[in-house]
Structure formats: C-alpha cells, structure tokens
C-alpha cells in the first residue's frame, strides 16, 4: 500500500468544499467520475491493483489522470485476495479473454449476453470497502465510483440495486453513517459518457480500457469494443493507440 495524502486535519481545513474519495481505475468511466469529483468536491483518489493483466498500465493511467486533474491525495492498494481467488480471465492466465467481433457485424460480433468470464467475483465490494474506510478517516462525505449499467458487460456489481444496498451497509457500518456511495454515470449509455467527458475536458488520452494489452489496446476484447463503439456513436475519435488489426473497428 502506498499513501500520498494530507492528514485529516489538513483535509478538513480546506475552505468550503466537502470531501470525496473517487475510485479511479484509469478507465474512461472512472476518469469522468474523477473529473466530476474534482469539480464539485475536494477529491482524493484510490487505485486498487488486484493482479489484473494490465495492472501496470492501469496504474500509470491513474497517476497521469491524477496529475492532470491536480488530485494530490492518492491511495494505491494491492489486493492479493482477488488474484488468489481467481475465477476471472482478468486475474487467471489460464482463462482466455474473449474476443468480440467488429462493430456493426451483427450477432456474431455482439458483446456477449450474460455475465462474462471477465467478471471478477464481487470485486467492487473490495474496492468500495477500501474507499469507504479511507473516506471515514479523511472525513469525506462521498465515494464516487464509475459503475455503468447500460451498454456494460452485464456485471452484477454494476446494478443500481447493488449500490442502494451497499449504501445501507455503509450507513450501518460506519461511525457517523454519513458517507454516501455515488454513481453519477450508472444510468448513462457509454456514448453519453464520452460526450459528457468531452464537454468536461476529461483526459481520455490518458485512460486505458483494454483487458489484455498494455502498449497498444487490442481492440477486440469486450472492453475495447464497448469503448470503440461509444466513441463511434458519440461521433468522436478515440485518442488512445490500438493494434493495427483493430483499426477496422474505428
């Protein structure tokens, strides 16, 4: 664990702004959340590494986004339990990351229906536990997470009812019960998130979404295809590099 943070007293001395902790993976959804948090509150950012395939690249995106947004208070956490538990293509090298066909090619290329093998079992609960714990120490009132239900991969921990239930846990399990987990993007389609991010000046060029590559995004995993489709539907150019084979998707 690496902590670069002001003390609670220094945090609370900031004039007139409430505090928020944002979970920042380095992807485009969490980046837009970080922009919203930094705009509306004094923001601190948490990044959790859990043995995922693109761990180093995601951490680099986290640091770069924080630098661009001026977020100084950062917490880097390594969760070894999720990798040890396995059960996901993101954490288990023996499970292949599925490749999705090109945009607009019909059913064979569609994003899979149901919970895919890239789902990391109960991952967001681990992330939220860290963020809420830190928010309680800092005296922050909100925890931002970039969960999205429409146009997502069908992950069960990205549903509104999950966050309603989690907020009840936070209310019952923290000293003052005043921390709220907020999900400003949860009802938005991916292309709407791209449009919002562009309006807010979100640094999409610093983000990373690919599940399996760290130098050039593969363009064919579930996450890449959802991202490419979102930029296409928003009428915008995705600023990150893709492998040559993925150029046909753009």
Where are these regions (language model features)?
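ATP-dependent adenylation/nucleotidyltransferase module used to activate substrates
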Residues: 2-4, 11-201
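Alpha-helix termini
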Residues: 39-40, 62-64, 214, 232, ...
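A polyampholytic, Gly/Pro-enriched intrinsically disordered region
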Residues: 99, 202, 229-233
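Local cysteine-cluster metal-coordination motifs and their immediate loop/turn environment
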Residues: 129, 208-229
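Short amphipathic alpha-helical interaction/hinge segments
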Residues: 174, 232-235
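Residue-level signal for alpha-helical context at structural boundaries
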Residues: 184, 215, 239-242
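Short, intrinsically disordered, charge-biased short linear motifs at domain edges
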Residues: 197-199, 204-213
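Short microdomains enriched in Cys/His and/or Lys/Arg
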Residues: 234-250
């Amino acid at each position: 664990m690496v902590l670069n943070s002001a003390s609670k007293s220094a945090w609370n001395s900031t004039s007139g702004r409430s505090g928020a902790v944002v979970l920042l993976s380095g992807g485009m959804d969490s980046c837009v959340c970080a922009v919203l948090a930094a705009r509306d509150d004094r923001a601190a950012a948490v990044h959790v590494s859990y043995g995922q395939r693109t761990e180093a690249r995601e951490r680099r995106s986290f640091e770069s986004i924080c630098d661009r947004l001026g977020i100084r208070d950062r917490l880097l956490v390594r969760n070894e339990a999720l990798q040890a538990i396995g059960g996901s293509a993101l954490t288990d090298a023996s499970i292949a990351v599925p490749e999705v066909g090109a945009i607009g090619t019909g059913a064979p290329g569609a994003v899979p229906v149901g919970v895919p093998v890239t789902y990391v079992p109960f991952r967001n609960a681990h992330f939220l536990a860290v963020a809420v714990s830190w928010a309680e120490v800092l005296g922050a009132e909100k925890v931002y997470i970039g969960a999205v239900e429409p146009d997502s991969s069908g992950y069960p921990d990205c549903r509104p009812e999950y966050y309603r239930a989690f907020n009840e846990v936070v209310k019952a399990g923290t000293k003052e019960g005043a921390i709220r987990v907020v999900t400003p993007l949860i009802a938005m389609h991916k292309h709407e998130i791209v449009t919002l991010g562009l309006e807010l000046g979100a640094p999409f060029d610093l983000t990373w979404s690919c599940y399996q590559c760290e130098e050039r995004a593969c363009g064919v995993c579930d996450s890449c295809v959802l991202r490419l489709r979102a930029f296409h539907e928003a009428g915008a150019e995705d600023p990150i590099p893709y492998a040559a084979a993925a150029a046909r998707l753009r």
